[in-house]
From Swiss-Prot:
Residues 454-533 are annotated as: Disordered. The gene is cyp14. Residues 523-533 have a biased composition (Polar residues). GO terms for cellular component: catalytic step 2 spliceosome. One of its GO terms (molecular function) is peptidyl-prolyl cis-trans isomerase activity. This is Peptidyl-prolyl cis-trans isomerase-like 2. It comes from Rhizopus delemar (strain RA 99-880 / ATCC MYA-4621 / FGSC 9543 / NRRL 43880) (Mucormycosis agent). PROSITE patterns: CSA_PPIASE_1, CSA_PPIASE_2, U_BOX. Its EC number is 2.3.2.27, 5.2.1.8. Residues 443-519 form a coiled coil. May catalyze the cis-trans isomerization of proline imidic peptide bonds in oligopeptides thereby assisting the folding of proteins. May also function as a chaperone, playing a role in intracellular transport of proteins. May also have a protein ubiquitin ligase activity acting as an E3 ubiquitin protein ligase or as a ubiquitin-ubiquitin ligase promoting elongation of ubiquitin chains on proteins.
Length: 533
């Protein structure tokens, strides 16, 4: 059986390391990591390290700005990245493309370029594409023509500008002119050298001091920003809409799993359709009265079971859509049909100005006299037309949506059934709907409750905000009134910062001394003095 050799303390060799004191930021490992990989973005010039305006590249795919690389080649004649010999005739002009959002993208697939995109260019034309595009449309298809200009090229003409799996060309720590610290190129990148201060006396010194001061301020701001760690109690809680779903829109997952979609990291709640959200809250039935020229028919609507159909019927009735509309079809021992403003049986529309789907439930059937159901032209073609059965019609089950029944006025229904009709089942005497009155409307009640709830929440949020401001104001009040922030003296901090507040004028001290002596002379008496006792 082996022995446990791991010690419960740090040994001397572990502390000392290979070259001295060992810690996460010192020792040979720390020194090697301090000068680690520094990546240059694909849209930056490899010489100025700034975004390029006139991009060109070398045959091995190193990108420069034309205005920067030409003077360098004329002076040194080498590649600033590799240190190898380079001539201006070897430079290849590149044609990058941007979308409406000013982002570089592939002009064929519209894929936005990022640091993780493999980017390639065609040497003969200079057009820049995503390498995936060239691989699918050129290499695998053996179509050796530029996808934009249709100019021929060979496989050797494909230049890799960025390969996420091979970033040696983008490693700034290995750039030749940076490793060798060429003074002219380092000086060119200073902003002060972009200003012509020649012949302006000591202006250059002023600019240098100003630049040093600005850099120190930027460093201090960066440190302060880093120290400000946002916490959950500093953020105002997001108010969700009343119809927010318990699931998200899925945009974040879509952007992470698809290379075509731009990155999206927010978790946004999906919103349920307002009507669909309302239908789930309806638990009551509706009641209405159909007023005809032959009498009144009271109906009960199954709003709790067929909310969409009942909502359509109720809203049409409340807007007067059914006023003065006739029953255009009347078949004895079967049904009476109406709800078409044109009176032809071919018109009528829903409140959404389009057909809406059926709400078929096996528990509600055409199994009795006085069943209220929707007329349609086929599956999911409901509009405004409806019919009332004179007898059971089981052959209509599963084809039409039953959404109510007659609960009063069956004698009026018998009168309507007895009216003679022509050969097209059209009543010979006009049967007209004068009006449809609503007695109980759960949809209107829901809207009223929802409005009151939203108003109450808005008022509560406003009151909470006012209370928070009032509490902050009260906390700022001290024992002797509002707390006044202390004004810092010109002496600043450090040693002796309180000395200035204790300085006094010598004349003031001397005056106080004279007044004190006068008071002592006035109050001095011989009584109680035992000096000569």
């Amino acid at each position: 059986m082996g022995k446990w050799t791991d010690k419960l303390y740090i040994t001397h060799s572990e502390w000392s390391g290979e070259v001295g004191q060992h810690s996460a930021s010192s020792g040979i490992t720390g020194r090697n990591s301090s000068g680690g990989f520094k990546r240059l973005p694909f849209y930056c010039c490899s010489l100025s390290l700034q975004p390029f305006e006139h991009p060109v590249c070398t045959p091995d795919g190193i990108i420069f700005d034309l205005m920067n690389i030409i003077p360098y080649i004329k002076k040194y004649g080498t590649n600033p990245v590799t240190g190898e010999k380079l001539e201006t005739k070897n430079l290849i002009k590149l044609h990058f493309h941007k979308n409406d959002k000013d982002e570089y993208f592939c002009p064929v697939t519209y894929k936005v370029f990022s640091d993780h995109t493999t980017i390639a260019a065609i040497k003969t034309t200079g057009n820049v594409f995503a390498y995936d595009t060239l691989e699918k449309l050129n290499i695998k298809a053996k179509h050796w023509k530029d996808l934009l200009t249709d100019e021929p090229f060979t496989r050797k003409d494909i230049i890799m500008l960025q390969d996420p799996h091979n970033l040696e060309k983008k490693d700034m720590s290995k750039f030749d002119y940076l490793k060798n610290n060429k003074p002219e190129e380092l000086e060119k990148r200073k902003p002060i050298n972009n200003i012509n201060v020649a012949g302006m006396g000591n202006t250059k010194k002023v600019f240098d001091e100003l630049q040093k001061k600005n850099s120190n301020e930027d460093d201090n701001k960066a440190i302060e920003k880093k120290e400000e760690i946002p916490t959950s109690f500093h953020k105002k809680r997001e108010t969700l809409p009343y119809n927010a779903a318990h699931y998200t829109t899925g945009e974040a997952a879509e952007s992470f799993t698809s290379t075509v979609v731009n990155a999206y990291t927010a978790s946004t709640r999906a919103l349920i359709d307002e009507d669909e959200f309302m239908y789930k809250k309806i638990k009551k039935k509706s009641y209405a009265r159909i007023i005809t020229n032959y009498g009144n028919i009271n109906v009960e609507l199954f709003s709790d079971k067929k909310p969409k159909t009942c909502h359509n019927f109720i809203e049409l009735a409340k807007t007067g859509y059914y006023n003065d509309v006739i029953f255009h079809r009347n078949i004895k021992k079967f049904m009476i049909q109406g709800g078409d403003p044109t009176g032809t049986g071919k018109g009528g529309e829903s409140i959404w100005k389009r057909y809406f789907p059926d709400e078929i439930k096996t528990t509600l059937k055409h199994d009795a006299r006085g069943v209220l159901s929707m007329a349609n032209r086929g599956k999911d073609t409901n509009g405004s037309q409806f019919f009332i059965t004179y007898a059971a019609a089981p052959h209509l089950d599963g084809l039409h949506t039953v959404f109510g029944k007659v609960v009063g006025g069956l004698d009026v229904l018998s009168k309507l059934e007895s009216i003679p009709v022509d050969e097209k089942d059209r009543p010979e005497r006009e049967i007209k709907i004068k009006q449809i009155q609503m007695f109980v409307d759960p949809f209107e009640e829901y809207q009223r409750r929802l409005k009151n709830k939203l108003t109450h929440e808005a008022n509560a949020e406003r009151e909470n905000e006012e209370m928070r401001k009032r509490r902050e104001k009260e906390e700022k009040m001290g024992w002797f009134g509002p707390s006044v922030p202390k004004i810092q003296t010109s002496g600043g901090g450090g040693v002796g910062k309180y000395l200035q507040s204790t300085k006094r004028d010598n004349s003031e001290i001397s005056n106080e001394g004279e007044e004190l002596q006068k008071k002592q002379k006035i109050t001095k008496t011989t009584f109680g003095n035992f000096d000569n006792f």
